[in-house]
Amino acid sequence: SKYCVMNSKGDIIRGKPARDFVFYSRSGYSSTYYKDWIPDLKETQAYAAERGAHVIGSAGAKDINGWKDICRTIEDCGLPMVELNFGCPHPAMMPGVHGGSMIGQEPEVAYEVTRQVCESVDIPVIVKLTPDQSKPLAIAKAVREAGAAGVTAINRHTGFVVDIDTGQPRIGGPAGIGGTWVKPLSLRWVHRIHEELGMPISGSNGIFDHRDVIEFIMAGATIVQVGSILMVKGIKWLPKIIEGVEAFMDEKGYASVDEMVGLASRRSVKDYSEQFSRNRVHAVVNPDTCKNPTCNICIQVCFYEALSQNPEGSIDVHTDNCIGCELCLDVCPFDSIEMKETAPAQFDQGFFNIPEGIFEHDKFGTRRNNMDTIRANSPKFNKEPAE
């Protein structure tokens, strides 16, 4: 194995990792035969059971017999659940190996491996998904149909990092990459799977502290996995995460984790037509706290020409251009901007509004980007045959 922990600039950290750390790593073939783990698994499971905890086994193999044998061994050791790792990015770099994320990119293979494992054991089976594909939802559907009790969303991406001072790739070449920066990407799939399939989810990839754990839960995860941050900060970081979650629940009045599961996912819009049909807002600038012209960052970042400086040096808001995107609100360092709801009467006064009918279905359905409509509307495919 090779590990490389970097800051957001790509430099190796020297000391405690910041919240935006990047964890770049590569693991090779296991040097330990899986049956050599049996004493440790039994001891760990007994220790956990005495303390009301659970141990979930993790399996990866090069052929179907290996998958079944390892999972049966995990069950025989008394573990209550096993995870099939269809997300590991490393097998793609191992000559002659077809496993990990390679299986996780093929719905048919993922289905069959999951089906045979589920038939071989009596404990619940979950599947760890890979982000190195365009359709994790399809894999989640396939493994659910094959008998999986849930999925883990989501494993590490495959990356490539360069040391520009030496011109060399970090740790030799492509490797798995994760860290808190990837959390929004992970949360996307947690949300989608929760929304579309409603199946149990173990959230993973992007956790630093308790606030990240809570985000995963509110996106739809029923449990979470914490790995990279424990490797760089030590196992003693885990109790701090748990304590933080408990303190947050007490502060906000949540009686159980179940009350938080999928909370944000259920409140999410389904598509952009719903997003823009909600109440319109516009920016309002407080001249008493605004520091323009010393600071005019809001004017600089507004792509819609909705803000300008008037002759007196204060900020004018052009409500006919302000679409309510809130970028000025986010970048203002003096908290001088707020967004106010646009009243219906203000639209008649020229305040910006979404043009009527813009999201009508036929506007998007007339020419879809598929081969049938492309061919139908392309002169190349519609030439009369030569006589």
What residue spans do the PLM features occupy?
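C-terminal accessory/binding modules appended to enzymatic or scaffolding proteins
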Residues: 279-312, 316
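Extended, hydrophobic interaction surfaces within ordered domains
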Residues: 192-197, 212-268, 317, 323, ...
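C-terminal helical cap(s) of enzyme catalytic domains, especially alpha/beta-barrels
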Residues: 6-19, 162-178, 229-254, 348-358
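N-terminal capping/small domains of soluble enzymes
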Residues: 1-72, 384-386
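Flanking helices and flexible, charged tails adjoining ferredoxin-like Fe-S electron-transfer domains
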Residues: 247-255, 259-278, 287-288, 297-299, ...
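Short secondary-structure boundary segments
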Residues: 1-3, 86, 155, 228-229
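Alpha/beta enzyme core
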Residues: 50, 62-202, 208-223, 270-274, ...
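Short beta->alpha connector loops at strand-helix junctions that form conserved
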Residues: 1, 205, 227-228, 340
